C-alpha cells in the first residue's frame, strides 16, 4: 500500500505541476498577444502616433504578436507533452519561425535604442539623420538578418553538426547548434546589440542627468530629482528586462554550440527559452506604456469604450424619462419616437460607410450628443403642438 500511495502522490504532484505550468504559459501567451494587439490598435487609430519614431515600435509589436500567435502555443504544447507530435517538416518550419521572430524582436529593440540615441544626442539633426528611406532600409536589414539566421541557415543545414537538416529523434524538436552557428548567431543577435545598447542608453542617461541639473537652476531641486529618478528607472527597466530575459538563453545557446546539443538540461533549456519569450510580453509595457503619447492613446482607447457604454445607458435613461412624461398627453406617435431616438443615439456610436472614422470619444462629445437629443425632442414636441394633424411628418422629421 505504501508504494502505491507514493506513486499516487508523485502522479498528483506531476499533474499539479503540469496544471501550474500550463496556467503560467497560457497567461504569458495571452499577455503577449493582447499587449501587442493594443499597441498596433493604438497606432492605427491615433494619427499622432504615426511617426517615423514609432515605426520600430510598431515593427516590434507586430513581431512579438506573430511570436505569440505562431510560435509560443506550439512551444507550450511541446513543453507540456515532452514530445513533438507535428512531424519533422513542420519542426523545421517551427524552429525557423522561432529563431526568425526572436532575432527580429531583439534587432527591433536595438534599432529603437539607436533611434532614441540620435533623438537625444543630436535633436536638431534628427530629422536629417532619421528619414523614411533610412527607416525602411533599417527594417529591411532587420528581416534580412533574421531570415538568414533562421530559414536559410536551418534549411541549408548550416546550424547542424552532421550536415543534416533534422535530428535523429522524431519526438524532439529544437534548433541544432554547432560551434560556428552558435557563436555567429549569439554575437549578431544578442551580444553585439547588447554592447551597443549599453553604450547608447548610458549616453542617454548622462544627457538626462545633465538636463535635470540644468533644470535644477530654474525649477525646484525636488522636481529635478524626480525627473532624474524617472529617467533612471525607465532606462534601468528597459536594459534590465532585456538582459534578464535574453542573457540566460544566449549563454545556454552558445554553450550548446561549444559542448553539444545535449549539454544543457532540458528543464533549464525550457526555462531560459520561456524567459526569453517573456520579453515579448514586457515590450508593450516598456516601449509603449512608458511613452507619454502611447499612454494618452491607451487612455483614449479604453475611455472610448467606457464612454460609449455610459452614453448608451444615459440615452436609454433619457428616452425612458421622456417617454413616461409624454405618455399622458401623446398617443401612438410617442411610442415610436423613443425607438427613433434610441436608434439615432446608436448611430452616434457607429460610422456610416464613407464618413470619417471617429478615433476617440470624450465626455464633452457625450454631453453634446445628449444636449442635441434634448433639443431635437423639444423641437419635435413643439412642432407637434403647432401642427397636430400631421403626425407622420413629425416622425420622419
Curated annotation (Swiss-Prot):
The record marks 98 as: Essential for histamine binding. One of its GO terms (molecular function) is histamine receptor activity. Coiled coil: none annotated. One of its GO terms (cellular component) is plasma membrane. Keywords: Cell membrane, Disulfide bond, G-protein coupled receptor, Glycoprotein, Lipoprotein, Membrane, Palmitate, Receptor, Transducer, Transmembrane, Transmembrane helix. Residues 1-22, 82-92, 160-179, 258-266 are extracellular. The record marks 185 as: Essential for tiotidine binding and implicated in histamine binding. The record marks 189 as: Implicated in histamine binding. SUPFAM superfamilies: Family A G protein-coupled receptor-like. Disulfide bonds join 91-173. Glycans are attached at residue 4. The H2 subclass of histamine receptors mediates gastric acid secretion. The activity of this receptor is mediated by G proteins which activate adenylyl cyclase. This is Histamine H2 receptor. The lineage of its organism: Eukaryota, Metazoa, Chordata, Craniata, Vertebrata. The gene is Hrh2.
Amino acid at each position: 500500500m505504501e508504494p502505491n500511495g507514493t506513486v499516487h502522490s508523485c502522479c498528483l504532484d506531476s499533474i499539479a505541476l503540469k496544471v501550474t505550468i500550463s496556467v503560467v504559459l497560457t497567461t504569458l501567451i495571452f499577455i503577449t498577444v493582447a499587449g501587442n494587439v493594443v499597441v498596433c490598435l493604438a497606432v492605427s487609430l491615433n494619427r499622432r502616433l504615426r511617426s517615423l519614431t514609432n515605426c520600430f515600435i510598431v515593427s516590434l509589436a507586430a513581431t512579438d504578436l506573430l511570436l505569440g500567435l505562431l510560435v509560443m502555443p506550439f512551444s507550450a504544447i511541446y513543453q507540456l507533452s515532452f514530445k513533438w507530435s507535428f512531424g519533422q517538416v513542420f519542426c523545421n518550419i517551427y524552429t525557423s519561425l522561432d529563431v526568425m521572430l526572436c532575432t527580429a524582436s531583439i534587432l527591433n529593440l536595438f534599432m529603437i535604442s539607436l533611434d532614441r540615441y540620435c533623438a537625444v544626442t543630436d535633436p536638431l539633426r534628427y530629422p536629417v539623420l532619421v528619414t523614411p528611406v533610412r527607416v525602411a532600409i533599417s527594417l529591411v536589414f532587420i528581416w534580412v538578418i533574421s531570415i538568414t539566421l533562421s530559414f536559410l541557415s536551418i534549411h541549408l543545414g548550416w546550424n547542424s553538426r552532421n550536415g543534416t537538416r533534422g535530428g535523429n529523434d522524431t519526438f524532439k524538436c529544437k534548433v541544432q547548434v554547432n560551434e560556428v552557428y552558435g557563436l555567429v548567431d549569439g554575437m549578431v543577435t544578442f551580444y553585439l546589440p547588447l554592447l551597443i545598447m549599453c553604450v547608447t542608453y548610458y549616453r542617454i542617461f548622462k544627457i538626462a542627468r545633465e538636463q535635470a541639473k540644468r533644470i535644477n537652476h530654474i525649477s525646484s531641486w525636488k522636481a529635478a530629482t524626480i525627473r532624474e529618478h524617472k529617467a533612471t528607472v525607465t532606462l534601468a527597466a528597459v536594459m534590465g528586462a532585456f538582459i534578464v530575459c535574453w542573457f540566460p538563453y544566449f549563454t545556454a545557446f552558445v554553450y550548446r554550440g561549444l559542448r553539444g546539443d545535449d549539454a544543457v538540461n532540458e528543464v533549464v533549456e525550457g526555462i531560459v527559452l520561456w524567459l526569453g519569450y517573456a520579453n515579448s510580453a514586457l515590450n508593450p509595457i516598456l516601449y509603449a506604456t512608458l511613452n507619454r503619447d502611447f499612454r494618452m492613446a491607451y487612455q483614449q482607447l479604453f475611455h472610448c469604450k467606457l464612454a460609449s457604454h455610459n452614453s448608451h445607458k444615459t440615452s436609454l435613461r433619457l428616452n425612458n424619462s421622456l417617454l413616461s412624461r409624454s405618455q399622458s398627453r401623446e398617443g401612438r406617435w410617442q411610442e415610436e419616437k423613443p425607438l427613433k431616438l434610441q436608434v439615432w443615439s446608436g448611430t452616434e456610436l457607429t460610422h456610416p460607410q464613407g464618413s470619417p472614422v471617429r478615433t476617440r470619444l470624450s465626455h464633452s462629445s457625450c454631453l453634446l450628443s445628449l444636449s442635441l437629443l434634448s433639443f431635437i425632442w423639444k423641437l419635435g414636441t413643439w412642432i407637434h403642438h403647432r401642427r397636430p394633424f400631421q403626425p407622420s411628418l413629425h416622425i420622419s422629421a
